[in-house]
């Protein structure tokens, strides 16, 4: 017997019992994005490798260790996208969407990173992200954060996430800080772990993000990034904090928050949780005013964020179990008797025409009433429509509320209006 082929490690199937909750969560997220004026953009999952090397940075963990890169049959180097911002910027430049224009875009889809699979961290994962181009003030940064805060309220998880905020300043200010940080770290090379030693010269700001408690202890006396900010970045950050204060959004300034991608400047933020163990980051983003020009476009400010859906689903399940998937079926149509199936299917189409948002499933495969009602219960139906030979002959249908057990007989012409009342 042939050996079963299984999914690749870290790339998961999501079965019907799981996707219903995903759909409800995604629907809520998309509704909020629409209410803020964002439009969807759909992007390829494969891009030219140089796009990510130029955007993310050649000495980042993502580019050095985590990308799925391969040569196609023409010898071109291609990469499965590890994040969404670079592709969104590439598309904006290619299609003339950015220069001297304001754009508010969102995307959703799979991303790929070769990491060690664990709960909340996978090799294929799904992100929803939003990007704003053409606006450089702190007000749009604040509105993006307010949008994410609305997401948490909609999902009932506001009490389980907290906002961390920082400014990493301009490229010039960050270069000055980098020199000061390296000079400080060089005094303690014997106390740094191997990863921090490597990062000290390739991407020293990433040492600030070390998970090693000994390294974090060393950093207590390190130069503070905030002391090296340029005046414009200080004013921008002060404006952002004032807007968040006015909106009642609580935050913590974390001067070690730097993000792992090279394109950020000024604002960086993360929403974090303590409810998912070590995988604490739920949503993260920041400002990238130089990225469009870096990728070949004209200078255009940008700011955005991305959120991993797998981690969000886990968080909702952990802290708000009352947020449940919508039922697969609202109405189940039960038919019994000789030559009733055709009439039942016509009735089902009539109801779907009149109530286009309603999920109606028609029984197929026969079975007595008991078996058909068991199927209705399995699918979570609230209402059963019952037609037999006598109902068809009289032009009627029995409507049964499966929760209360109450049932009534109505004409087929009035069944849609009756259902509309029952379903609210």
UniProtKB/Swiss-Prot annotation:
> Span of the secretion signal?
none
Annotated transmembrane regions:
none
Q: Which GO terms describe its molecular function?
A: ATP binding; histidine-tRNA ligase activity
At the top level of its lineage, which domain of life is listed? Bacteria
Question: An example Gene Ontology cellular component term from the record?
Answer: cytoplasm
Catalytic activity field: tRNA(His) + L-histidine + ATP = L-histidyl-tRNA(His) + AMP + diphosphate + H(+)
Keyword ATP-binding listed: yes
Q: Mainly resides where?
A: cytoplasm
Q: What subcellular compartments does it reside in? A: Cytoplasm
Q: Which family does it belong to?
A: Belongs to the class-II aminoacyl-tRNA synthetase family.
The protein's assembly and partners: Homodimer.
Q: Please identify the protein, giving its name as recorded.
A: Histidine--tRNA ligase
Q: Which organism is it from?
A: Klebsiella pneumoniae (strain 342)
Kindly list the organism's lineage: Bacteria, Pseudomonadati, Pseudomonadota, Gammaproteobacteria, Enterobacterales
| Gene name of the record | hisS
